[in-house]
Design a protein with these regions (language model features):
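Sec-dependent N-terminal signal peptides
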Residues: 1-6
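Flexible, surface-exposed loop/gating regions in the mature catalytic domains
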Residues: 18-267
Length: 267
């Protein structure tokens, strides 16, 4: 009888003292285009983010032109592609991975009409939408950018990928135009409960202006994290590894051997 009481008390005490596992943060990614670090920082809003939050100061793209970088960010490999043509690649990538593991996600494509992800209708271009390549079609998770505002006010997915159109991403238009778009879009995200509840926003440029170093600006925007600059060598594979680790899924492709950006995501 006495032993039973002791066991009951012990189990009850352990149950009361158990600390629940912390909830996974919402993760957002915005991919900008074709600027060196110095060029990107000419945007006053971008510069203010870099001086307030966290920056990977030794971050590089994985190749040229755009498409290999987008594939690296979403699958951990480039498939040997060195152009922006359309290919039907094996089904997979982070989207399929998240779906298989029950993690909600959406990819927001600015300029894309509903159901038209394979059609290049300016200012939307397919080669800035990596999800269109895996399996030769877009899953229903790929939606127009205009859906983002409502999602941020309602049922926000755990992972949100955002591709601006080719003007707002600074590919075809000036740094100032893209910087103004970032001000509006980042403001919308950082006002949401998904971000204020320990969310993570990564802003990265896919490649530089064609130099041999291919160093690009990569920033981590998260509430409650003080300014920090990391000199660790990172690439798009590092960012993919960081996203996958944060969301609790396995690492794809070359992300498996990459160093995660934990010095920038930890408190």
């Amino acid at each position: 009888m006495g032993l039973a009481l002791i066991l009951t008390f012990t189990v009850g005490a352990c149950s009361r003292n158990a600390t629940p596992a912390p909830a996974k943060p919402h993760v957002f990614v915005i991919v900008m285009e074709n600027k060196t670090v110095e060029q990107a920082l000419q945007g006053p809003f971008t510069a203010s983010l870099a001086s307030t939050y966290r920056v990977a100061a030794n971050y590089s793209g994985v190749g040229y032109p755009s498409l290999p970088n987008y594939l690296a960010l979403t699958s951990g490999q480039t498939f040997g592609i060195r152009n922006d043509n359309y290919y039907v690649l094996p089904a997979g990538g982070i989207g399929a991975q998240l779906t298989a593991t029950g993690v909600t996600w959406r990819a927001y494509m600015e300029g894309m009409a509903h159901g038209g992800c394979l059609e290049n209708t300016y200012p939307y271009v397919t080669h800035h939408n990596p999800f269109a390549y895996y399996g030769g079609k877009c899953p229903s998770n790929v939606v127009p950018f205009t859906d983002l505002a409502a999602d941020l006010k309602g049922n926000t997915p755990m992972f949100g990928w955002i591709t601006p159109d080719v003007c707002h991403d600074q590919h075809d238009c000036s740094v100032s135009v893209g910087d103004a778009w970032l001000r509006q879009t980042v403001g919308m995200i950082t006002e949401s409960k998904a971000w204020t509840s320990n969310g993570l926003l990564f802003i990265v440029w896919d490649e530089d202006d064609g130099s041999t170093e291919n160093r690009v600006l990569s920033m981590v925007i998260s509430p409650g994290k003080s300014h920090k600059v990391s000199k660790q060598g990172y690439t798009h594979y590092s960012l993919l590894a960081t996203i996958e680790d944060t969301l609790g899924v396995g690492r794809l492709g070359q992300a498996a051997g990459a160093k995660a950006m934990t010095d920038l995501t930890a408190n």
